[in-house]
Amino acid sequence: MAGVIMAQSLTHDAMTLPADWRDLLALTKPRVMSLVVFTALCGLLAAPGDVHPVLGFSSILAIALGAGASGALNQWYEAGLDARMKRTAGRPLPAGRLDPQTALQFGIGLAAFSLFLMLFASNWQATVLLAGSILFYVVIYTMWLKPRTPQNIVIGGAAGAFPPLIGWVAATGSIAPLPVLLFLLIFLWTPPHFWALALFVRSDYAAAGIPMMPVVAGEKSTRRQILFYALIMAAAAIAPWPLGYTGALYGWTAILLSAIFVLLSVQVGIRTTAEDDRMQPEKRLFAFSIAYLFILFGAVVADHWWPL
């Protein structure tokens, strides 16, 4: 409830302002949404069988809208926390450009429409998974895990791991081993990705009172855990090839990219920081982790359509 109360305190200026489409778009976290959409699309394209282009597009649009709804409801609930962090203070709600009621209505409306569209375009199984991912991100991660435990990213990573599974189920109506492995890959990728970010914005999280791992356990422990998760993530990334679910194109891509990821994680894991440190290794790992997922999921599709 603290997030809601703080969000309501921001309305004194914003209540008089009309909603701008750019602010509504910002609520959906477009950069995060782009990765969600891409991994969902890869899950759909890697699935067996043919999907009608219109229904396939509608399913991916539904996933995008669901991700946008999750982002909007997250920002509505965390407006007060965002106002205390330099990185997020310019967002529409803490900056006073949008009132919380509009953000809440927008998020709920977007979520409802995304579920209706998914049900119309694909099947009830994909719709249930999409609803579960929205609820998990908003309720389990945002409202419960994030303000309470440094394991918020570890457990909450499941929310961001749903898209390829939803894309696959939208195309087939059933779950198979490959999308489950892709779910596991994103789940294990999430801690080193976000903890690399948390290391170089640690002061922001500390100021907002968010118990991220570097704030609670310290930098040394966080660095060790980044390396640990990078190693098991690499194993999960490579696993589809020896298990027979992908071919050599994906396999060699996964080996090369995972080796780079682990090397960057080693650089982060073994170092100590000084007061004036610019955190360049951490920033390199964070940036590469995004490219890693884009390229690896692209390789899943390429391997499916053009196997070696």
Curated annotation (Swiss-Prot):
Transmembrane segment boundaries: 32-52, 53-73, 102-122, 125-145, 153-173, 180-200, 226-246, 250-270, 285-305
Enzyme Commission code(s) on record: 2.5.1.141
Origin superkingdom: Bacteria
Keywords: Cell inner membrane, Cell membrane, Heme biosynthesis, Membrane, Transferase, Transmembrane, Transmembrane helix
Listed GO MF terms: protoheme IX farnesyltransferase activity
GO biological process: heme O biosynthetic process
Biological pathway: Porphyrin-containing compound metabolism; heme O biosynthesis; heme O from protoheme: step 1/1
Coiled coil: none
UniProt keyword tRNA-binding, yes or no: no
Catalytic reaction(s) noted: heme b + (2E,6E)-farnesyl diphosphate + H2O = Fe(II)-heme o + diphosphate
Primary enzyme class: transferase
CDD domains: PT_UbiA_Cox10
GO cellular component: plasma membrane
Membrane topology classification: Multi-pass membrane protein
Localization per record: Cell inner membrane
Record carries keyword Transmembrane helix: yes
Assigned protein family: Belongs to the UbiA prenyltransferase family. Protoheme IX farnesyltransferase subfamily.
Annotated function: Converts heme B (protoheme IX) to heme O by substitution of the vinyl group on carbon 2 of heme B porphyrin ring with a hydroxyethyl farnesyl side group.
HAMAP family per the UniProt record, alphabetical: CyoE_CtaB
NCBIfam families on file: cyoE_ctaB (TIGR01473), PRK04375.1-2 (NF003349)
Additional remarks: Carbon 2 of the heme B porphyrin ring is defined according to the Fischer nomenclature.
Identification of the protein by name: Protoheme IX farnesyltransferase
Gene: ctaB
